[in-house]
């Protein structure tokens, strides 16, 4: 089957056609021809879409799906359909399933179940057994089975020595270690950003300091051990500064930010809407501005949806009792496109995350695999619960 894309603006800094409007013929999964105009003849489907833009396929590095164990939240099949509909050709699935993705067989199960689907699935395996932070999981075996990185989703590694050993051990096979930026002792039982709003609303606060201390610890360890460290979903201005300074020292550290942390503040909590209860918590306008600048400066490498669907029974309750998490795949592009330059978004969703996580990126050139995302940067829509797959 062949498809002809008419008048598509190519956004791909690795392509010789970057920022050019071209016709693109795709045949048998590969880009057969790119030209100013390709005649609309032959046995292929012609797509003429308003303000069509294309880029290398989007890759989301932090997606939670409910299978196995929490299928009431989202099944693997449904989650992959949502990703494809939202423009993502690849996703990395977090280890917070039940049982936890902490073994070779668990990694293989997910890869086999997602085989031959529209969206590629890459497991991020647990760093520790059952994500309890007590004993390192069999990292090498899981890497050989297809795991692309190792981290306990939203669970910080409290044991300093265990984190040190993980960073050292992973170097034997060029493994990427993830460390969630939160110090549990400082965070305590907090459920919202510590500040004026949490005080006014009577909500227990989580100081940004809890994030800073954990990041500082991990950077000290990384400086000692070497290796590669990725810090997922940072949320505060000081975190940007810490990581930027570490990069200047030459440390192999990267980080991501969730799309919602680029646009939403803790002012949203005045409605006590539990859909805004996230980990890390929504922070301040000053933090948002620093995060946006961090993307522009290169201190922040990746934008993720941090998609984490929660069933209504655990969301439609009192704010203090609700589980953290929100759906993000469907809205990530629309949200971030309102506050960032298009090329910054594309870079942080394509070339940068693929390079960091070791996924091949296919430039938009003739002969390459057609791993592409289609979008309209000027399109508008209102996302409602009726749109949820």
Locations of regions flagged by a protein language model:
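N-terminal metal-binding scaffold of metallo-dependent hydrolase/deaminase domains
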Residues: 1-41
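His/Asp/Glu-enriched, well-ordered alpha-helical/loop segment
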Residues: 200-226, 296-297, 302-303, 308-378
